Amino acid sequence: MLKLFISPGACALASHIALEEAGADFETRVVDLRTGQQRTPEYLAVNPAGSTPALQTDRGVITQNPAILAFVAQTHPDRNLAPIDDPHAFAAFNAFNGFLSSSLHPAIGKVLFSRPPLEAGARAEAVEQALARYQLVEDHWLQGPWVFGDGFTLADGYLAVFTRWARSAHLLDSARFHGLNAHLDRVQARPAVSRVLAAEGLSAV
């Protein structure tokens, strides 16, 4: 059985959604980031980087959301969770997930999770930079009701992690980000996503 290490509400939510959408046989283990559980010898033996998500498989541990999403899609091809049979489309899927991981996540994370919190001027600049990345998705990546057009992929669940964070912080203006807000509503309405939110003690935002 697959074992996914998560911290509720954190970015590992994307991998949790992926496994639930795939109908995978898996269990979750909570890593409490607030108490520093990610730095314990027990967890560092799973993921030496001390971060979540980490997916324990029968062949070893996979870390980083983009890698886990690709693994889940490729090991559950019947669920059509990514365009795994089209090299160009699959590259686009991976590129988008890479953007979320390397660009959008750090940008919104700086706004919300900097310790100590940013001073007013620095926070305003960080918000502007984060919103520019959301704008890029709004204007250039959303190709329909879902990121890649008419069909849901695991990239949609990943994007929803960060639109949830932005909406919760009142940064996802409904007029400026109409597409992203509508997309988030669609993702949160999916039965698999509802089950994952409930399992992590979360609710739709």
Q: How would you label these PLM feature ranges?
A:
Residues 1-125:
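GST-like domain detector, emphasizing the conserved glutathione-binding G-site
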Residues 32, 154, 200:
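Short, solvent-exposed turn/loop segments enriched in Gly/Ser/Thr/Pro and often Arg
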Residues 72, 176, 205:
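Glycine-rich, phosphate-binding/catalytic loops in enzymes
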Residues 77, 170-171, 201:
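Glycine-centered secondary-structure boundary/capping sites
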Residues 100-191, 196:
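GST-like fold's C-terminal all-alpha helical module
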Residues 196-205:
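Terminal-tail/helix-coil boundary detector
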